[in-house]
């Protein structure tokens, strides 16, 4: 199976090479959506979660990009722990992680797992990044 996922965040990291343990560097996840596809490309599962802000706010500059305000995420979001549980279920079913510039999203979620001391297999799976030299101008 192939897991395609994307996140929306509170912004961008100051240093893309910083370790995931540098919590001040990595922005917070405010939304995650994913699809699981089988080997024939058929959609098996789709999930989309707004994440309730836990001791952080969503800056206006980020809200202007993705449209998710602190108020919206607070009202309609779910606990990050629920997201971890559901995402780990999806990770347990997949052989590959796929996405456009997916390293960013992997780091965002990896930093979230680290912040909360949750073990994940996210960093153990092979990655297929659709952001190639040919598509780089679109990234």
Regions found by a protein language model. Give the residues of each.
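Glycine-rich, highly charged phosphate/nucleotide-binding loops
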Residues: 75-85
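Alpha-helix initiation/capping motif
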Residues: 23, 73-76
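Short acidic, Gly/Ser-rich segments with clustered Asp/Glu that frequently serve as metal-coordination loops
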Residues: 7-15, 20
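Metal-dependent phosphoesterase core characteristic of DEDDh/y 3'-5' exonuclease domains
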Residues: 2, 15, 26-70, 88-139
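Acidic-residue sensor for enzyme active/binding pockets
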Residues: 8, 23, 112
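Short consensus segments that form the blades of beta-propeller domains
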Residues: 20-26
């Amino acid at each position: 199976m192939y897991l395609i996922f994307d996140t929306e965040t509170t912004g961008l990291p100051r240093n893309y090479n910083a370790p995931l343990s540098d919590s001040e560097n990595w922005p917070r996840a405010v939304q995650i959506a994913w699809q699981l596809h089988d080997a024939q490309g058929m959609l098996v599962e789709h999930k989309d979660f707004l994440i309730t802000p836990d001791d952080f706010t969503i800056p206006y500059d980020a809200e202007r990009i993705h449209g998710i305000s602190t108020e919206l995420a607070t009202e309609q979001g779910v606990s990050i722990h629920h997201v971890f549980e559901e995402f780990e279920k999806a990770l347990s079913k997949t052989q590959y992680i796929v996405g456009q510039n997916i390293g960013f999203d992997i780091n965002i979620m990896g930093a979230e797992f680290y912040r909360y001391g949750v073990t994940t297999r996210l960093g153990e799976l092979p990655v297929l990044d659709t952001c190639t030299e040919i598509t780089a101008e679109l990234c």
